[in-house]
Amino acid sequence: MVKVMVVAEVRPSEDVNKVLSAISNFFDFEKTNTRKEGIIDILVLEARTLKSLLKFHRVLRNERILDSARKYLMKGIEGNTIAFMIHKQAAAVGVLSFVDNDKESPLGAIKFYIEYQNPKEVVDWLAPRTAHGVPLWDNPIPPDV
């Protein structure tokens, strides 16, 4: 079973549509929920297919950041989940920038959670190992089981 979930704070100074647009640069969601935590809205976007990450897959190659992405994705594996964060303001202009913690993105990071039976298979598809910047393999998208 596949579950991709993206969580982002929407602060009072932000426009929810701009945050959705930033996320949409990398992720095609099927379902949207919003909840309130004090004065902050929390967006929770979900999809049940790895195809929702095809934009993310493409951007990793276009920006030539496969090695960096692989490091963040591998570091984020716990059990059957991959967790990582990207910079919200960079995402708003279509640039993918990983962050180590929420404080690195002044308006809060965008958090990704990918649940899959074999997370390393997802990492190998999204960000394969490289040699001199060239991917060593180009795996097909893992099946949605």
Curated annotation (Swiss-Prot):
Cited InterPro entries: PAB1135-like, Ribosomal_uL5_dom_sf
UniProt xrefs under Gene3D superfamilies: 3.30.1440.10
Family: Belongs to the UPF0201 family.
Protein name: UPF0201 protein M1425_1179
